[in-house]
Amino acid sequence: EGLYYSYGYYFGKIHVDPNNSNKIYTYGVPLITSDDGGKTFYTIGKENVHADHHDLWINPNKPGHLINGNDGGVNITYDDGENWIKNNSTEVGQFYSINVDYQKPYNVYGGLQDNGVWMGPHNAIPSKRWNMTGKYPWKSILGGDGMEIQIDSRNPNIVYTGSQFGFYSRLDLETGKRRSVKPVHELGQSPFRFNWQTPIRLSSHNQDVLYYGSNFLHKSIDKGESWETISEDLTKGGKLGNVPYGTLTTISESPINEDVIYTGSDDGMIYITKNGGKTWKNISKDLPQDLWVSKLYASSHDENIIYASLDGYRWDNF
């Protein structure tokens, strides 16, 4: 079954044991091995080994000694995967986003690459004593790839967050209830394109208003219960592939004027509306082209000023 659902994606690799040409290790989502030169395979990842494997070191001097790097960190085995040690001393979590609420003490929220969304008090003291007390100060509130987090400033128990490709929900931390808020295209309409890190934004002017980016900008005035698409396609259009392209990557609402909204896309487009989405203008024509708009921040002092960051590392442009 390990082969059936696996794919290479960008991290799939194959290794051959340096001392045994019939011993093969291959990995992508699972970590599997063969003892007969690839005729048969079996899984060697165990319950404490995270999926999505990126690297493997095979000890040339000690058969069965492996060090595995995966989306959950580092695991070590001395018996060829029968038992694994989880290396918890290596801090390798990668945050996609961070936010805070207004409680006292305030909580910090973080969306982590393939390790979900976590929250905890800002004054939590890092300590391994929780292993004895059982009281870990940080709490997981969502799984998958943890993406953006928006907290209702009127009620900090209401949190909007989600995982990859735009699967966001409205969480009630007090009751544990969760409701999907993802916009859905109409019958006969082309499906929306959602970025891996789909942007969302709660309005600072009205916390019932939520903005959601696909290749369009969507607006809800009832906390994500219903949606209105308030723009045309704000990208250059999609491209064929297994990962959506031509998608919005960032949204910024002016803290001065609720009708002024900016969007940025993965293909370098920055748009502005000054009338709440009735009309839009491309303001990126004089910028370097085809770069990823990584973040937009509307000025708190002048509604006509926007701060933008663009990157091109995906095209080796540093």
Please place each PLM-identified region on the residue numbering.
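Beta-propeller blade termini and top-face loops
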Residues: 1-318
